[in-house]
Amino acid sequence: MALDVDVDSLVIGGGIVGMSVAYGLARKGDRVVVLDGVDDAYRASRGNFGLVWVQNKGLTRPGYARWTMRAAQNWAALATELYDLTGVDVELQQPGGLTMSFDEGLLTTASKKLDALGEELGIRYPYERMNVTELKSLTPDIGPDVVGAIYCPLDGHVSPLRTLRALTQALISLKGELVPGVNVTKIEHRGNEFVVHSNKKAFFAKRVVLTAGLGNKVLGEMVGLNVPVRPQRGQILVTERLRPFLKHPCHYVRQTGEGIVQIGDSKEEVGFDDATTLAELSRIAARAIRCFPVLKDVNVVRTWGGLRVMTPDGYPIYEESKQYPGAYVVTCHSGITLAPVHAGPLVEWMHKGSQPQEIQSFTSERFNV
């Protein structure tokens, strides 16, 4: 057995959510170790679409809308900070995002929902309803079936893989450590610290943060936390490089800086099956072609399936264990969008005990009603 390790904060889960929290903790001066799973673990970060997305978030929970806006407004600062520390460009672009519509009635419904959310927030919600003429001024290549779109100036996208690399390198630059291939078998609370047993060694920490995605369900039980998460499959198509035609990312189509186009936004309840299916890939491809006919004859170079981490109501869980104070769970399905607030105000809560107002209702207790 290797020597035990004693740290300030132990983060279990090395995806986007975990590395954002770990980086934030290291930035506060903690000695941080991140335990990451084995190579065949289900990883939402590897299948991420890369959107920094605000519109339509929090329609039934205004606090989440505020939290998401706060994150998007701080993404540029985080991207700059990561570049200065690591030299890794996460390829952030925030030109505003588009949700295309093929139906005027649905477009009207979407507008009314955003207006109502703005009233609840006490603001004019940051969006524009665009007709076809206005939309073509932004995106000339739309198809004839598109009747308009919702545009939100806060939306954008990043490279998920570059973001994960930048966060990891930033953590290491702040004397943090990432330990791969770890299977946590038991978490104990002894006195003022936690003992985390694994297949490699025992880790001692004053604070334990569970960010293991779908693995949080089992890990949470070890520290008195209820984490009712389930997998939801999403499938993605990646095309060959194309001429730049899509400056503004859409909810299910985006073009990267290299010119490739990603097509996605499928939602399937199929358990832990992360395979791709011809039927679903065909459906999302047809929708993308309907939006942008230029995609009709392009070559697809890659497809993959990934598993989102979903709670019963689709919103995050941010909670400290009442039974074992110092043990936290952080779980969500918008790890890219929320990275700045996970590295910032969420870490402030863990250090100072004052939870951000926007997320005070996001404990698992809401599922007991």
Model-identified regions with their sequence ranges:
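Central helical "cap/lid" subdomain
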Residues: Y42, S198-F245
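C-terminal catalytic lobe of FAD-dependent flavoproteins
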Residues: F292-V369
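Helix-loop-beta segment of a Rossmann-like dinucleotide-binding subdomain
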Residues: G87-S101, P126-L174, S266-V270, P325, ...
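Helical element adjacent to the flavin cofactor pocket in flavoenzyme catalytic cores
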Residues: I150-K206, G215
